[in-house]
Amino acid sequence: MRPESAAIHGLRRGVLAQVQVLSQLGRGADAIVLIDRLYGQAPDAGMAAIRQRLTLGEKIAFDVVRTPQDGMAEAYFSLATLLVGQTNDTLTLLNARIASALRPDHVEAVLMAARLLDKLGQYDLSISAFAQVPEGDAAYVSAIIGQAASAQSAGELDDAVTLLKDLADKNADNVGVLGAYGDSLRRQDQCGAATAVYGQAIALIKTLVPGDWVLFYKRGGCRQNQGDWPGAEADYKQALTLAPGEPRILNELGYSYVDRGENLPQALAMIQQAVAAKPEQGYIIDSLAWAYFRRGRYENSVAPMEKASLLMPVDPIVTDHLGDVYWMVGRKREAQFQWHRALSFHPAPAEAARIQLKLDKGLDQVLQDEKKAQEGGNGG
C-alpha cells in the first residue's frame, strides 16, 4: 500500500514502516519529506518525535514487524482499522483485542481497544486498557487523558482529577494536558482551581488560533460561577473573536446578558443566531424563549419554551422556565404543574426555594418581592 493510501485509511503503521525502511536505507531526508507530506504541520506526538530524530541524523530501527506473530498482529490491527465506522464496534474491538494480545506493546491497538471499550460503556475495561500504555511512550499523555475520561464516565471523579493532576505536574508546558486538568476540576465544581489552570494553559499560547476559543469559553464559565462577571464577559468575547458564529459562545453570552437584564436586543440577536445554527439543541431553544420572556414578549416565548421542554423533558431549569411562561400568559394551573415537576427533578437548593415561593405566592408576588429587595439593597 502506498503511504498516501495508508494515511487516507488511517493505517499509520504503514507510514511508520516506510519511514523506518527509508531511514535504514540511509534516506532520512526522504523519510522527513514523507512525514511532512502526509502530516503537514500537525504530526502526532510519536511521529513528531521520529521526525526530530531523523532531523538529527539518527537512524530509526525497523521494528514494525519483527516476528511472524508481529505480522499477525499487524494483520488484525489493519482489519480493525478498516472496520472502524463500517460495522458494529464489537467486531472492530475483537480484532483490536486480538492484535494487542498477539503483541502487547502494539500501542495503537491498545488505544483503539481502550477507546472502543469506552464508547461501549465498558469503563472499567477501558481504564485498564489505557493503563497498559507505558510512561515514556509518545502516546502516554493521550492514554492518561483517555483513562481519566473513562474514570469520569464511570463516576470516579476524584480518580479522574488525580490522574490529570499528576499528568499536569509532569507536563506543565502542555496546553492540552492543562486544558484536560482544568476540565476535570470544573466538573468537580472546583471553579477557582479550574480558572487558574485554564489561565496557565492560555499563558503558554504564543499565537492564538481559532481552536483556542474553548479555553476562553470554559474559563469564562468558571469566572461567571465565581461571580466575576467582568472577567467572564471578557473571556466570552475573546472566545467569540476567535470563533465567530460558534453557537455555544453566542448562547452562553446571550443568555448571560438576558439573565442580567443587559444588552437585551444584542442578546436576542446572538441567541437567534445560535438557534439557526443548532435548531434542535434544547438549552439554546430555552435561551431564545427566555430572551423573549425577559423582554416582555410572553406570547412569543411559549412555542420555543415548549419545544425546549420536549427536547429536555427532565431538566429542572427548563421546566421552571416553562412554568414562568405559562403563568405570564394566564395559564396558571399549567404553570403550577410545571413548577411541581421542576421540583421533582432536584434543582439546586436556591432554585428549589424560589420555585416553592412561586407555588406559595405566585410568580407576580415573587417578582414584586425581588424587585423591592433589590431596590432596598441599592438604597432606593
Model-derived regions, located:
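Canonical tetratricopeptide repeat
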Residues: 17, 50, 78, 112, ...
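Structural marker of alpha-solenoid helical repeat scaffolds
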Residues: 3-7, 40-41, 68, 102, ...
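TPR-adjacent "capping" and linker segments in tetratricopeptide-repeat scaffold/adaptor proteins
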Residues: 4-8, 60-75, 206-209, 213
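Position-specific recognition of the canonical hydrophobic site in helix A of tetratricopeptide repeat
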Residues: 23, 84, 118, 152, ...
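Residue-level recognition of tetratricopeptide repeat
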Residues: 11, 20, 44-45, 72, 81, 106, 115, 149, ...
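TPR alpha-solenoid repeat register
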Residues: 14, 47-48, 75, 109, ...
